[in-house]
Structure formats: structure tokens, C-alpha cells
Amino acid sequence: MVRCRVRSPSESPQQGSGQQRENERQDQDQELRPEDVPVYGRTHRGRYHYRHRSHTRRRRSCRRRRRRACRHRRHRRGCRRIRRRRRCRRRL
């Protein structure tokens, strides 16, 4: 993190032309600010990022997928019970 440097009163010139003061202001504006510095590494990409994967998944049975769903989530929500169970429709 870059911290802004604060000049002491004795360090800053009391007298001088207006042009020098303008140059000093521009120099202060060009200093790096924490929000301007690019962040490398992990950044917040959104909460649904884990679902989109480049590799193709192998097909699994519905039971296995359903069990894993609530464990996989970060905030462990209870499994939602489905009143009507559907059977897998496998194409031959």
C-alpha cells in the first residue's frame, strides 16, 4: 500500500511564483493512490463463479448430484425437500 507523504510547514516554500505552486499541485495529483493501484491475485468475481467450469462434467446419477448440492455450497443451507421425486430419464 502506498501512503501519501505529508510535508511539514518548514519544508514547503512560503514564497515563490504561482507557477511553482501549480507544479507542486500537479505532482501531488500524480502520486499513486491506493484505489488506483491495480490489484493482482484473487478478486471478487461474483457468487455464481464456481458453477461455470471450462471442463465438461461426467454425468452422474441424480441421487449423487442432489446429495452433494447442499454440501458444496459455502453457506450450508438445509436440503430442500422435494415432495414429488422425479426419476432419471436416461436415453439409451
Swiss-Prot record:
One of its GO terms (biological process) is nucleus organization. Residues 42-76 have a biased composition (Basic residues). Residues 1-76 are annotated as: Disordered. InterPro entries: PRM2. Testis. GO terms for molecular function: DNA binding. One of its GO terms (cellular component) is nucleosome. Residues 7-20 have a biased composition (Low complexity). Its main location: nucleus. It holds the Pfam family Protamine_P2. PANTHER family: PROTAMINE-2. This is Protamine-2. It comes from Sus scrofa.
